[in-house]
């Protein structure tokens, strides 16, 4: 556990990556849903 890559722990990188992926998917679905709703 002591050998961290550089200065950033691996769990922080995983957490940030997961949040970014979930955020992008949420924005994509929200954009498509609101786009379909506004077109009707």
UniProtKB/Swiss-Prot annotation:
Main location: plastid
Domain of life of the organism encoding this protein: Eukaryota
Coiled-coil region list: none
One cellular-component annotation, GO: photosystem II reaction center
GO terms, biological process: photosynthesis
InterPro entries with a match to the protein in the record: PSII_PsbJ, PSII_PsbJ_sf
Positions of transmembrane segments: 8-28
Intrachain S-S bonds: none
Keywords, alphabetical: Chloroplast, Membrane, Photosynthesis, Photosystem II, Plastid, Reaction center, Thylakoid, Transmembrane, Transmembrane helix
Location of the protein in the cell: Plastid, Chloroplast thylakoid membrane
Family: Belongs to the PsbJ family.
Subunit text: PSII is composed of 1 copy each of membrane proteins PsbA, PsbB, PsbC, PsbD, PsbE, PsbF, PsbH, PsbI, PsbJ, PsbK, PsbL, PsbM, PsbT, PsbX, PsbY, PsbZ, Psb30/Ycf12, at least 3 peripheral proteins of the oxygen-evolving complex and a large number of cofactors. It forms dimeric complexes.
Task of the protein: One of the components of the core complex of photosystem II (PSII). PSII is a light-driven water:plastoquinone oxidoreductase that uses light energy to abstract electrons from H(2)O, generating O(2) and a proton gradient subsequently used for ATP formation. It consists of a core antenna complex that captures photons, and an electron transfer chain that converts photonic excitation into a charge separation.
HAMAP family named among the record's database cross-references: PSII_PsbJ
NCBIfam families named in the record: PRK02565.1
Name under which the protein is recorded: Photosystem II reaction center protein J
Organismal lineage: Eukaryota, Viridiplantae, Streptophyta, Embryophyta, Tracheophyta
Underlying gene: psbJ
């Amino acid at each position: 556990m002591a050998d961290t890559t550089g200065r950033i722990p691996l769990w922080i990188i995983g957490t940030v990556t997961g949040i970014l992926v979930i955020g992008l998917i949420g924005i994509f679905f929200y954009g498509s849903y609101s786009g379909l709703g506004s077109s009707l």
